[in-house]
Amino acid sequence: RYLLISLIAGAVLLGAYSLFFIAPTYESTAKLYVVSASDDSVVNLSDLNLGTSLTADYEQLMLSYPVLNRVIDRLNLDSTSDELAKAFSLNNPSDTRILEITATSTDPQMAMDLAETMAEEAIDYLPDTMSTLAPNLAQPAKLPESKVAPSYTKFTIIGALLGLLICAA
């Protein structure tokens, strides 16, 4: 009987905690396609290899303070470049010249604005810095339809397990 009460109490307590005290977070992703075309405007193997190298360079420079400060200025944010960098994750899927820019925020509109603005500022700033052609916006950021965290189910199950452990102790 105490086992069941502990199970339910733990589940309810941690589930309620996650529902009322942990702000939901949202993610939005924009994608850039990085390819370099030769002077004759025909993409060849050398251009594709250069595009792959440029993608890795872009990935490193995207979170540099000049780009982040441009995002801060454009969106009138009250944060530092170091703080803003934590809102972004960059991913370059294997064997592609695609660069995924994912922004995370407690506001779905802000997540979309961050990802979209970062992509636009990268397209504008990085080619001049690197003396290359601008990447193409392959996918604009979109408004997230659902939260990515917290998982209420996960917290409820963990709470139930903690309730069982406390009862067993």
Segments from the language model and where they lie:
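Hydrophobic and amphipathic membrane-targeting/association helices
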Residues: 1-169
